[in-house]
Amino acid sequence: MFRSGADDPLSPSCLLRRLSGRRVGADGQKQLVAAVKFWYNGVLGKNLQLDYLYPDRPEFKIPKVFSQQDIKAMLNVCENIKHKAILATIYSCGLRLSELTNLMIKDIDSTQMTVTIRQGKGNRDRVVVLSEKLLLLLRDYFVEYKPKEYLFEGQSGGKYSERSVQQVLKQTLAKAKINKEGSVHTLRHSYATHLIEQGTDIRFVQELLGHKNIKTTLIYTHLTDATKRKIKSPLDNL
């Protein structure tokens, strides 16, 4: 089909030039290499070793978290009860941004003291614990805002926008004078980290976060401040 490897747009050398000459994301690079591997190895039967073309594994980064003092400060400066309820719900339930905006009133079970997160990441439902403090806060919020279907709704009805939630957090961080970079997902990271700090079994944390693979949850077993304080210097044993 091709006269030579140099003319072959699927040759490893051509592929390398394409990857270096364009801004190809890691996922796109994986798909491209997999397709070329299939062509050479599966169709042409050449059995070329192309694994070196896969993107390097990203560096491990410990997720950023807010301290419990940070969380308390945020909630204390929230004068708008809706904003306070939004941030408290994310942190208390370890929610992703989309899970928060998709929460419906029917998902809150004050009898069983549970919150059902429907169709989370990977289209998997899960159930988390409903905090007693959160329930009291939500009841006060209900009295004032009277949502009809979604737990948090926009001014014209329908679910609250993700952008609005992000703006709430940004304004709250500034008001609480917390000079840390953080996003809505940082609240979820904080929830997981604080659970582990208080001794919650990693398997329970995995279930509460909705992680399919325990390896994803294990990133939260990094050395937390609480763990560091328990470590004794060998000098103290002399």
What would you call each of these model-derived segments?
Residues 1-238:
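Conserved catalytic core of the tyrosine transesterase superfamily
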